[in-house]
């Protein structure tokens, strides 16, 4: 079995029984189960949700995206070995830690395979919940050019690149393109303020005005739980993105939960603690891959300029990245996962065949 065979690059073609189109994201694909299969699993597996809750199989891939494009490597390598399993393992660990600390639930009901979650359908909040503890990345670039107000928050003068911020900052942006909201352009990833959310809370998916306080509390509390755990293994939790949504519990009440992934190298910046104390930045996240791309291609503006998206897409499509660069990302992701979870990350030789076998034999979901 070759290295390329061990990578799950295409994850939207599994023969899972569904009566809806498969939703394919940059990294994950979602298979909505039939009503009959959802009800059967809720009953036979004992999931603690209402019996009419729609369920889905969420399958992660090993694809690597950056700057809104999917990249690939030499030798037919269409993804990063171990990346999908590492991301899921990290999220699973943090969700468990959240539960132990009395925070909200997640959308995950079952974990049949390292690449697979069984999730309940949620009503998503249309906000990318971003939390920052250090000034770096896009915030630093804007600050260095004179900007001081970010998402309605004024930063002090005299901050330096990569330094710790005086307070943990919440800098939300829009999730998807939202129309008809005063003062908010109909574009993806537009920075918004808490005032924007309060004035239009229902348009952003909040059911109650006071849930804005709850979302901010869950964001900050989740950040602090992960930050403390990472500090224990000498890693710095720099910034991250969470997602939230509502589900209905067995008593018919709405509750706010964590969605998607949390605290991973894809959704966060994580720095090596020893290097940071020495005045250096050693990325243990996707940011290292982004920096590689900016240095690898002769015209980095293609990757940064949104007006050059067709060129960027062609660049990603037509260039095989060096194998060593892809394997460095693999080492970063699996290394962080092993530090966080304290366990080796399984790398199945043929993940697709394994997934099909488990979903057939243990869940009866394969056509």
UniProtKB/Swiss-Prot annotation:
Catalytic activity: 5-amino-1-(5-phospho-D-ribosyl)imidazole-4-carboxylate + L-aspartate + ATP = (2S)-2-[5-amino-1-(5-phospho-beta-D-ribosyl)imidazole-4-carboxamido]succinate + ADP + phosphate + 2 H(+)
Source species taxonomy: Bacteria, Pseudomonadati, Pseudomonadota, Gammaproteobacteria, Alteromonadales
EC number: 6.3.2.6
A biological process term (GO) from this entry: 'de novo' IMP biosynthetic process
A cellular-component GO term for this protein: cytoplasm
Protein name: Phosphoribosylaminoimidazole-succinocarboxamide synthase
Keywords: ATP-binding, Ligase, Nucleotide-binding, Purine biosynthesis
GO MF terms, alphabetically ordered: ATP binding; phosphoribosylaminoimidazolesuccinocarboxamide synthase activity
InterPro entries: SAICAR_synt/ADE2_N, SAICAR_synthase_Vibrio-typ, SAICAR_synthetase_CS
Claim: Nucleotide-binding is one of the keywords in the record: yes
Biological source species: Shewanella sp. (strain W3-18-1)
PROSITE patterns per record: SAICAR_SYNTHETASE_1 (PS01057)
Pfam families: SAICAR_synt
Pathway the protein takes part in: Purine metabolism; IMP biosynthesis via de novo pathway; 5-amino-1-(5-phospho-D-ribosyl)imidazole-4-carboxamide from 5-amino-1-(5-phospho-D-ribosyl)imidazole-4-carboxylate: step 1/2
Family: Belongs to the SAICAR synthetase family.
């Amino acid at each position: 079995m070759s290295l390329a065979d061990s990578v799950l690059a295409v994850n939207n073609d599994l023969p899972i029984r569904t009566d809806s189109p498969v939703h394919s994201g940059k990294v994950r694909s979602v298979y909505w189960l039939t009503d009959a299969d959802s009800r059967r699993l809720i009953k036979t597996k004992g999931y603690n949700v209402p019996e009419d809750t729609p369920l889905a199989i969420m399958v992660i891939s090993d694809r690597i995206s950056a700057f809104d494009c999917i990249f690939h490597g030499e030798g037919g390598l269409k993804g990063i070995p171990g990346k999908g399993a590492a991301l899921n393992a990290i999220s699973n660990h943090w969700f468990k830690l959240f539960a132990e600390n009395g925070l909200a639930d997640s959308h995950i009901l079952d974990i049949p395979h390292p690449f697979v979650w069984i999730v309940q359908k949620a009503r998503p909040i249309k906000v990318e919940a971003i939390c920052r503890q250090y000034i770096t990345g896009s915030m630093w670039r804007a600050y260095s050019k004179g900007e001081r107000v970010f998402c309605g928050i004024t930063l002090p003068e005299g901050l330096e690149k990569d330094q710790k911020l005086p307070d943990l900052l919440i800098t939300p942006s829009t999730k998807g393109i939202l129309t008809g909201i005063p003062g908010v352009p109909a574009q993806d990833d537009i920075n918004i303020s808490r005032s924007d959310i309060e004035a239009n809370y229902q348009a952003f998916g909040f059911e109650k005005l006071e849930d804005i306080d709850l979302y901010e509390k869950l964001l900050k509390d989740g950040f602090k739980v992960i930050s403390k755990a990472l500090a224990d293994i000498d890693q710095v939790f720099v910034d991250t993105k969470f997602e939230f949504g509502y589900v209905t519990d067995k008593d018919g009440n709405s509750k706010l939960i964590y969605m998607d992934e949390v605290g991973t190298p894809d959704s966060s910046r994580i720095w090596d603690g020893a290097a940071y104390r020495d005045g250096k930045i050693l990325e243990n996240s996707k940011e290292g891959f982004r920096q590689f791309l900016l240095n690898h291609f002769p015209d980095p503006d293609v990757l940064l300029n949104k007006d050059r998206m067709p060129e960027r897409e062609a660049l990603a499509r037509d260039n095989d990245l060096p194998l060593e660069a892809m394997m460095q990302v693999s080492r970063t992701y699996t290394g962080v996962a092993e530090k966080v979870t304290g366990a080796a990350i399984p790398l199945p030789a043929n993940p697709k065949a394994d997934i099909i076998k488990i979903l057939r034999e243990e869940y009866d979901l394969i056509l």
